[in-house]
């Protein structure tokens, strides 16, 4: 009986100490809005790109680590996804290649603008260039591997 009384008293003390402190001015939308801290989680980094209609973010994911051989994979589409290129995750890093998957604007994990003026080949080519620069890829360490539409952008 004494143990039950002590346990009840401990629970009441614990509950009494749980009080909400001053409210926050943060809205629900602000709380859940994604913030890019620059930290890469599981190799993922959102890259900001500038377009004629504003800034957007595109998704990238890095596998492996090789300062001299980095391969940026360009998927087909436009507006297809990186998913069918995921098979390279099992091969490239094992062979010493660093690879970077990326979803072009309007694709899967990247922003989805509704402005049809963005869907031009020169704008997508400029996007690849902005991604290249943001990921610090240059002629000494960087290769493009594009499939279908991605091959057109790579040329």
Each language-model region and where it sits:
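The serine-hydrolase catalytic nucleophile loop
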Residues: 78-90
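Conserved acidic catalytic loop of the alpha/beta-hydrolase fold
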Residues: 122-142
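A short loop-to-beta-strand scaffold at the N-terminal edge of the catalytic core in hydrolase folds
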Residues: 53-63
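Sec-dependent N-terminal signal peptides
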Residues: 4-13
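C-terminal motif of bacterial Sec signal peptides marking the signal peptidase cleavage site
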Residues: 15-17
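Conserved alpha/beta-hydrolase
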Residues: 92-111
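Gly/Ala-rich beta-loop-alpha elbow adjacent to hydrolase catalytic centers
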Residues: 146-150, 154
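Short beta-strand element of the alpha/beta-hydrolase
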Residues: 68-77
